[in-house]
């Protein structure tokens, strides 16, 4: 292959990697979702945030629109477990922006910590699966009805190291993230026939309010976030680097953009080698 062709291809990449794209992000009012929303908007995307947290979601939109001459961000109140809410959110994006190019399934629950399955609440288990799996499924379903006629699109779901290995969170969380990974691969097989890419990302521990549920009781300190960061650092494979919401957002940006135009059905690990390491051996420790 000609090196000249390669050079011209790379030099033509826009600095705003999502310029003109329309993205719908569930759970975009706080945490990783908020970081994704802000990064996408910075890269030229028109964004729709779907969340239950009206005040926080509205504030994110207001901050994005300061100095803007036109509406490039909307907040939509919606519950990912309710099909009508998701259908309406997709319709809203199309009505206001003309299409839907990108779906980010970020809304999720960690589930209540319970080390003994005999005491695990069925209602807690079902709620976690409803948000993490059913929510992702419904969002994929309704995004697909817009993307299939267009013969293009990118869907990225937030998975986890808990979708690859066991023992890193509540049973409902780990089980649901394994399901999201399987759903991603299954939907990628179908939608690839229509030019639509479907991927997921699996981060290691990120210090967000949602993630604090993963912290074992004996590791909890007066400052919950300090305790979580110390616990994550002690158990990480990659030392000296703390995984942040912005690191995850950058990985999602890569999969959402045309930079990854031939990547589909993939699970991008953002774990510093955590899941490829047998921590019981301690050979290098």
Curated annotation (Swiss-Prot):
Its main location: cytoplasm. It is an enzyme of class 1 (oxidoreductase). This is Xanthoxin dehydrogenase. Changing residue 264 to N: In aba2-1; reduced absicic acid synthesis. Keywords: Abscisic acid biosynthesis, Acetylation, Cytoplasm, NAD, Oxidoreductase. It is found in: Cytoplasm. Predominantly in roots and stems, and at lower levels in leaves and seeds. Involved in the biosynthesis of abscisic acid. Catalyzes the conversion of xanthoxin to abscisic aldehyde. GO terms for molecular function: alcohol dehydrogenase (NAD+) activity; identical protein binding; xanthoxin dehydrogenase (NAD+) activity. The keyword Electron transport does not apply. Changing residue 162 to R: In aba2-3/sis4-1; reduced absicic acid synthesis. Its EC number is 1.1.1.288. One of its GO terms (biological process) is regulation of abscisic acid biosynthetic process. Pfam families: adh_short_C2 (PF13561). The lineage of its organism: Eukaryota, Viridiplantae, Streptophyta, Embryophyta, Tracheophyta. The modification N-acetylserine is found at residue 2. The biological substrate is probably 2-cis,4-trans-xanthoxin. GO terms for cellular component: cytosol; nucleus. Induction: Constitutively expressed and not up regulated by osmotic stress. Changing residue 236 to V: In isi4; reduced absicic acid synthesis.
């Amino acid at each position: 292959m000609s090196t000249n062709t390669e050079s011209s291809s790379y030099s033509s990449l826009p600095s705003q990697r999502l310029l003109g794209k329309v993205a719908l992000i569930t759970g975009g009012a706080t945490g990783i979702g908020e970081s994704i929303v802000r990064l996408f908007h910075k890269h030229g995307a028109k964004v729709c945030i779907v969340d239950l947290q009206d005040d926080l979601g509205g504030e994110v939109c207001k901050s994005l629109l300061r100095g803007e001459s036109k509406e490039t961000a909307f907040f939509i109140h919606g519950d990912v477990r309710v099909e009508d809410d998701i259908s309406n959110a997709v319709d809203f994006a199309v009505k206001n922006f003309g299409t839907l190019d990108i779906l980010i399934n970020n809304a999720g629950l960690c589930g209540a910590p319970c080390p003994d399955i005999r005491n695990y609440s069925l209602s807690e288990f079902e709620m976690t699966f409803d948000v993490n799996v059913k929510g992702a499924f419904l969002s994929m379903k309704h995004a697909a009805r817009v993307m299939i006629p267009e013969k293009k699109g990118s869907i990225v779901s937030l998975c986890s190291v808990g979708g690859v290995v066991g023992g890193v969170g509540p049973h409902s969380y780990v089980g649901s993230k394994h399901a999201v990974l399987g759903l991603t691969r299954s939907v990628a097989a179908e939608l690839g026939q229509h030019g639509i890419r479907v991927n997921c990302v699996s981060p290691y521990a990120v210090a967000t309010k949602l993630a604090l549920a993963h912290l074992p009781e004996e590791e909890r300190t007066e400052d919950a976030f300090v305790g979580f960061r110390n616990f994550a650092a002690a158990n990480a494979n990659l030392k000296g680097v703390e995984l942040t919401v912005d690191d995850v957002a950058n990985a999602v940006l890569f999969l959402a953009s045309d930079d990854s135009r031939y990547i589909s059905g993939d699970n991008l690990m953002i774990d510093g080698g955590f899941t490829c390491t047998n921590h019981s051996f301690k050979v290098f420790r």
